[in-house]
């Protein structure tokens, strides 16, 4: 069975990963996800307007010779948030390196020890599972429990 994921599936995974990932200042220095998520959310809000303005200004000034270039600029502007969502989707399905996998297992064990129910530890966790565990840890563990890692 192939490990490759289609574009549409990656975009859906990217959107869900964007919602799952805990946007916390403690994680900003360790993981690039926070910066990618902020840039992607900004792009989702702003880039459609940039695309429309780039085409409409050429039409408003009757500069139809420059319309093909403005359409290319518009397509590029619209593609920027899609690139961020695609990157997040690909990242969410990437297996964790050994150091992060052990960190995932330690966090999982700490949450289970405090009495919270979790799904069983994954043998080969992905960034998606790490995001779920980090989200759970920040919501349910107190600051003294998290001091070791952050």
Swiss-Prot record:
What are the entry keywords?
Answer: Cell inner membrane, Cell membrane, Membrane, Transmembrane, Transmembrane helix
The family classification in the record reads: Belongs to the UPF0208 family.
Q: Where in the cell is it found?
A: Cell inner membrane
Q: Which GO terms describe its cellular component?
A: plasma membrane
- Please indicate if the UniProt record lists Membrane as a keyword: yes
**Official protein name in the record:** UPF0208 membrane protein VP2081
Instruction: Offer one Pfam family short name for this entry.
Output: DUF412
Which InterPro entries does the annotation name? UPF0208
Membrane topology is:
Multi-pass membrane protein
> Which parts of the chain span the membrane according to its record?
42-62, 70-90
Q: Where primarily located?
A: membrane
């Amino acid at each position: 069975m192939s490990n490759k994921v289609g574009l549409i599936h990656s975009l859906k995974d990217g959107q869900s990963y964007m919602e799952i990932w805990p946007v916390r200042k403690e994680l900003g220095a360790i993981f690039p996800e926070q910066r990618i998520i902020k840039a992607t959310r900004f792009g989702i809000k702003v880039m459609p307007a940039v695309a429309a303005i780039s085409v409409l200004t050429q039409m408003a000034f009757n500069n139809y010779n420059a319309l093909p270039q403005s359409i290319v600029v518009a397509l590029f502007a619209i593609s920027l948030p899609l690139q961020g969502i695609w990157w997040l989707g690909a990242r969410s399905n990437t297996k964790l390196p050994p150091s992060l996998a052990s960190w995932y297992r330690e966090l999982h064990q700490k949450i289970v020890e405090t009495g919270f129910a979790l799904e069983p530890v994954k043998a080969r966790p992905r960034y998606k599972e790490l995001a779920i565990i980090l989200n759970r840890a920040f919501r349910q563990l107190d600051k003294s429990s998290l001091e070791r890692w952050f």
